[in-house]
């Protein structure tokens, strides 16, 4: 079992006043059914979740459960229940604890996610402002433009209302904001889900637009799009399981640029390990003086980074700074019918779980160690290494960035990562079926805990290189320019 903290094996998550604005077309769930679901959720999380009390005391967490129970004490539409559940799960402050878009029932998924309610362009949030990255054919909408308001609601207000529903570890709000970017990398976008549920619109929207180039203001009317249309805008063919996901290019001077936009390759039939093997052979043949690994936009998935680190080290690399912990040895029989997973070994850790105290067990991986080392592998790359990072990096990519920086294997360039130095939860999952409402909540099973006190933050790059609206307007990649400048000094 790998140490990466993938959101699922299958693929890939206010105010009550906002919730009541939802339409009545959604399925209704009676209070009696919701009370059963919240009791199940409470028992499962209090028994199995390793990070439940990382950022909340037991008393605080009990209060969160009580507030969810109160919200569900009256019947709700499934959309209202989904919002209440998502708001509750966000309070756990775990980047892998959410009502996973891809693990909902078909009926719930169709009802909640498939409507014609999505903005038709791509954008990212920069300094609290919605900045267009690609107009996607919307007339009079250009890269770098700011959407200052939608149907009269300011961009700042939209961001403020959506953030409480987004997932991230601890107080790493940069990750929460990054979750709300729409840049063509996700099959279902977090922004699309919560904006549609909280701010329902007719099939067109009025966009208040401000030009980054000259400050001119204008109003643009744009039609909303469906989930199918959103997926057609994606950067890669998501249905081709054989497509290469990584790419290798060489800049002048044979500087290698390894772009890795996604490590969620669980169902991929592409030989990604073979690609990395061949990439390092090419670097060796070309005697590349530097390697730039571009992880921007990559949340994580498999431990693909271990295959890269294996070529950067001359001896096996120990990962002793963090300890893996679980809350149980064997799952209670009464919970098993509600716990789906891809690997039933997660139901019984056996002798691999060694009691630490009344709350935790240490989970052993290899030779009595909590984490197996990364084994050195040739050919070793001896040149300069630069890794481009941003707030999306919150799971396996966060761990990779942390290992690279902590072991001085390379220079991190870009923006602070997601994840959290206080540890994250994942590695193995149950998909908790709340059968009465037809909703699901992801339940991570393995928590990593640092051996020494750490800040409540992601990894801060060695060199900060932030994207700006002007960069987007002009097509400039300032982070890559910075990385190439560092590489040129190799």
Show the residue positions of the predicted features:
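A hydrophobic, small-residue-rich beta->alpha segment in the mid-to-C-terminal subdomain
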Residues: 458-470
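Extended, charge-rich low-complexity interaction segments
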Residues: 265, 351-364, 443-458
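Extended C-terminal subregions enriched in glycine
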Residues: 384-406, 411-422
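Short, surface-exposed connector motifs at secondary-structure boundaries
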Residues: 288-292, 380-386
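Flexible, low-complexity junctional segments that flank or bridge functional domains
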Residues: 25-327, 332-341, 421-434, 440, ...
């Amino acid at each position: 079992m790998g140490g990466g903290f993938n959101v699922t094996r299958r693929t890939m998550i206010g105010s009550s006043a906002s919730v009541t604005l939802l339409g009545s077309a959604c399925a209704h769930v009676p209070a009696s059914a919701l009370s059963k679901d919240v009791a199940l959720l409470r028992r499962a999380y209090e028994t199995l979740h390793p990070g439940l009390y990382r950022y909340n005391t037991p008393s605080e967490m009990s209060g969160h459960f009580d507030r969810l129970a109160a919200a569900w004490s009256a019947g709700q539409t499934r959309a209202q229940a989904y919002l209440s559940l998502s708001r509750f799960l966000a309070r756990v402050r775990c980047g892998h604890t959410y009502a996973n878009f891809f693990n909902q029932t078909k009926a719930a998924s169709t009802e909640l996610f498939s409507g014609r309610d999505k903005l038709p362009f791509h954008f990212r949030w920069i300094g609290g402002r919605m900045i267009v990255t690609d107009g996607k054919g919307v007339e009079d909408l250009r890269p770098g433009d700011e959407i200052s308001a939608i149907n009269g609601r300011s961009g700042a207000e939209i961001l403020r209302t959506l953030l409480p529903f987004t997932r991230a570890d601890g107080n790493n709000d940069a990750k929460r904001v990054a979750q709300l970017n729409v840049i063509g990398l996700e099959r279902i976008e977090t922004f699309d889900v919560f904006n549609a549920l909280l701010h329902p619109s007719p099939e067109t929207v009025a966009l208040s637009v401000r030009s980054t180039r000259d400050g001119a203001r204008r109003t643009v009317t744009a039609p909303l799009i469906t989930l199918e249309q959103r997926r057609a805008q994606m950067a890669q063919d998501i249905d081709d399981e054989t497509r290469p996901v990584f790419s290798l290019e060489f800049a002048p001077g044979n500087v290698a640029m390894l772009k890795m936009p996604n490590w969620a390759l669980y169902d991929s039939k592409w030989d990604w390990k073979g690609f990395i093997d061949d990439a390092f052979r090419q670097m060796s043949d070309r005697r590349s003086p530097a390697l730039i690994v571009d992880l921007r936009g990559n949340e994580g998935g498999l431990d693909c980074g271990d295959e890269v680190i294996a070529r950067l080290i001359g001896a096996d690399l120990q990962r002793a700074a963090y300890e893996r912990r679980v809350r149980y040895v064997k799952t209670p029989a009464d919970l098993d019918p509600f716990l789906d997973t891809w690997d039933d070994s997660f139901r019984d850790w056996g002798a691999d779980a060694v009691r630490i105290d009344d709350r935790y067990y240490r989970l052993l991986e290899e030779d009595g160690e909590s984490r197996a080392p990364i084994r050195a592998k040739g050919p070793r790359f001896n040149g300069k290494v630069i890794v481009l990072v941003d707030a999306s990096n919150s799971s396996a990519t966060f761990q990779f960035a942390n290992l690279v920086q902590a072991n001085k294997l390379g220079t991190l360039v870009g923006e602070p990562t997601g994840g959290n130095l206080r540890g994250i939860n994942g590695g193995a999952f149950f998909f908790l079926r709340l059968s009465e409402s037809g909703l699901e909540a992801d339940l991570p099973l393995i928590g990593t805990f640092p051996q020494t006190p750490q800040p409540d933050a992601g990894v801060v790059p060695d060199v900060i290189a932030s994207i700006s609206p002007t960069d987007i307007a002009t097509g400039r990649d300032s982070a890559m320019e910075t990385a190439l400048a560092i590489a040129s000094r190799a």
